[in-house]
């Protein structure tokens, strides 16, 4: 793979899906910048696991709700690991609110973390001379009555994906993965069994079904501005 020995930044990669993506990239020889906000203990444990793959890796703390923190994150990664060739925008809020109890501060926070931070990171990475890939993780369902600001911000990320794909071509390809219900790590209790029978595939997704899509995006230099739903077909119902 052409990205062996290159550097990847995965936001929100201390645990859950972000961790699994970081572990996958490390397993195929890609250096990993492990980002976290508050989950320092999880980040330490994940970094320990990642380093078993004998690649360069380090952990970086940043609250992505502020521009200066996004810029400092990239500065620290560049100084520690070097320039970034792969950016996976995984960090996200997931706040419950509806039209009636949503405040402007909620909109500002969710839009900054979910939309503006990916924009800032993408723009700054593009200022270098490298070629690379950006993958935005979103949700199969962005119109959500009870996660109002989350859904709005994820809907906007789809527009960002296409706008960046045009603006950053041909050096970078920017694509999107819209996730449905995914099996949690084996050490995390699940209360999502009711979702298993939703959708044509009648089950939740697996982590390897996400990482195989990421591999495809990394390998292919002619796909950009595309969204792939990994949701067992729920988006077509």
Each PLM stretch: what is its role?
Residues 7, 14-15:
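Conserved glycine-rich cofactor-binding loop
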Residues 30-44:
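Conserved glycine-rich Rossmann-like NAD(P)H-binding loop of the short-chain dehydrogenase/reductase
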Residues 71, 93-108, 146-149, 186-190:
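Conserved mid-core segment of classical short-chain dehydrogenase/reductases
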Residues 90-95, 233:
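Conserved NAD(P)H cofactor-binding loop of Rossmann-fold oxidoreductase domains
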Residues 85, 93, 100-120, 135, ...:
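Catalytic Tyr-X3-Lys loop
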Residues 128, 206-230, 235:
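C-terminal substrate-recognition "lid" of short-chain dehydrogenase/reductases
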Residues 169-173, 224-225:
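Short, small/polar-rich loop/turn modules that mediate ligand/substrate recognition or access, typified
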Residues 133-169, 181-182:
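Catalytic loop of short-chain dehydrogenase/reductase
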């Amino acid at each position: 793979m052409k990205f062996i020995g290159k550097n990847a930044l995965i936001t929100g990669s201390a645990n859950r899906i972000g961790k699994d993506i970081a572990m996958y990239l490390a397993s195929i020889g890609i250096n990993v910048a492990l980002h976290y906000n508050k989950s320092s203990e999880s980040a330490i444990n994940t970094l320990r696991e990642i380093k078993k793959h004998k690649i360069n890796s380090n952990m970086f703390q940043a609250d992505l709700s502020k521009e200066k923190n996004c810029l400092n994150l990239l500065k620290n990664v560049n100084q520690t690991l070097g320039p970034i060739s792969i950016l996976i925008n995984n960090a996200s809020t997931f706040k419950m609110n509806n039209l009636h109890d949503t405040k402007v501060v909620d909109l500002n926070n969710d839009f900054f973390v979910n939309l503006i931070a990916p924009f800032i990171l993408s723009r700054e990475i593009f200022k270098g001379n490298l070629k690379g890939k950006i993958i935005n993780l979103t949700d199969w369902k962005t119109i959500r009555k009870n996660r109002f600001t989350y859904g709005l911000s994820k809907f906007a990320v789809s527009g960002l994906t296409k706008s960046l794909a045009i603006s950053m071509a041909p050096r970078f390809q920017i694509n999107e993965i819209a996730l449905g219900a995914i099996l949690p790590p084996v050490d995390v209790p699940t209360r999502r069994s009711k979702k298993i029978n939703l959708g044509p595939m009648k089950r939740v997704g697996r982590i390897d079904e996400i990482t195989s899509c990421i591999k495809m995006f990394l390998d292919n230099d002619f796909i950009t501005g595309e969204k792939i739903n990994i949701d067992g077909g729920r988006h077509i119902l």
